[in-house]
Amino acid sequence: METLCLRASFWLALVGCVISDNPERYSTNLSNHVDDFTTFRGTELSFLVTTHQPTNLVLPSNGSMHNYCPQQTKITSAFKYINTVISCTIFIVGMVGNATLLRIIYQNKCMRNGPNALIASLALGDLIYVVIDLPINVFKLLAGRWPFDHNDFGVFLCKLFPFLQKSSVGITVLNLCALSVDRYRAVASWSRVQGIGIPLVTAIEIVSIWILSFILAIPEAIGFVMVPFEYRGEQHKTCMLNATSKFMEFYQDVKDWWLFGFYFCMPLVCTAIFYTLMTCEMLNRRNGSLRIALSEHLKQRREVAKTVFCLVVIFALCWFPLHLSRILKKTVYNEMDKNRCELLSFLLLMDYIGINLATMNSCINPIALYFVSKKFKNCFQSCLCCCCYQSKSLMTSVPMNGTSIQWKNHDQNNHNTDRSSHKDSMN
């Protein structure tokens, strides 16, 4: 029976049950029987890590079982609960932050412009991921299995989970690129003052971003399936990427480099190019009476450019450890290396850190806007104070019209101070 279990587990590893390059695949396989085993796929082989035995069995690519890690490489239950706490914190902060950001842009007419529309699109993508994917992730961590793994709804979640995760990342990446291009356009046409409203070009960009993000995530929905397997005499099912066609095999082979190139390098390169062009444009137009007349106008645009640049830097910091771990698994790992077990432990820890940081990116943008942008900071304070006042009014049975009056008065007070900048504050 033990040999049969090992063969089944080895077969499972070969078809792709891995500690993956992205949160949805990694979390899927990490949570499935975390107290029983965790599989890790390197460049040429897969590990079967058993946490109930004193040693970890390493199954080389030739199928022999003479090589094994002398020490136990495992994922402790402490990490499971740490990840659960982190996920719950990200869920709360992401819900409040992104929902508040969307409310600010929707309720304040002076905030309805092109760049803010892109920021709202980014926040909505993060909110969808936080609301749908994070609860599934927490369930898997605590229950140790995929939700509804024995019915069709579990299959639906298995395809929806990676699809939404990849779509959310795509929306973030493409919105950051669009914001960088928008900042260059704003500086290049520095004599043009745009009024309130979302330009048609920006609306088309947002629709295109969402459509393209969904299209690029389709292979995830196609490839992820519920795969049954036997382990220690028991039948289990896990959600994983299982290539069943030539296209999916090709996608699985190049996915690491595709994710690194498109979902990480592209927004950084795009920002570097357009911010360099923007800097050159500003240096070439240092003089001129019109520029002096529009000095406050240009100051606002520089502040917005700084805000967008901050969002890109945060994105890079959050996602770099995860992509680095993936590249190391692709390029550094060697099954014949005597220190491969130490490398495995290091990559496991790196995956934990990288996935938590990558997930944190879904809730950190509203916080960054609060500290970087004075206008968003004022709006956040007004909105949150309004909510607190409304809650207090409900507890003390105060009529709700007082709340709306306070919000309107506060908005009127801020409107005068922001009148000179609302035309292009986030333009």
UniProtKB/Swiss-Prot annotation:
Residues 406-427 are annotated as: Disordered. One of its GO terms (molecular function) is phosphatidylinositol-4,5-bisphosphate phospholipase C activity. Pfam families: 7tm_1. Keywords: Cell membrane, Disease variant, Disulfide bond, G-protein coupled receptor, Glycoprotein, Hypotrichosis, Membrane, Phosphoprotein, Receptor, Signal, Transducer, Transmembrane, Transmembrane helix. Residues 21-80, 133-159, 230-256, 329-347 are extracellular. It is linked to Mandibulofacial dysostosis with alopecia: A form of mandibulofacial dysostosis, a disorder characterized by malar and mandibular hypoplasia, typically associated with abnormalities of the ears and eyelids. MFDA features include maxillary dysmorphism with dysplastic zygomatic arch, hypoplastic mandible, scalp alopecia, scant eyebrows and eyelashes, severe hypoplasia or aplasia of eyelids, small cupped dysplastic ears, conductive hearing loss, cleft palate, dental anomalies, micrognathia, and limited jaw mobility. Receptor for endothelin-1. Mediates its action by association with G proteins that activate a phosphatidylinositol-calcium second messenger system. The rank order of binding affinities for ET-A is: ET1 > ET2 >> ET3. This is Endothelin-1 receptor. The gene is EDNRA.
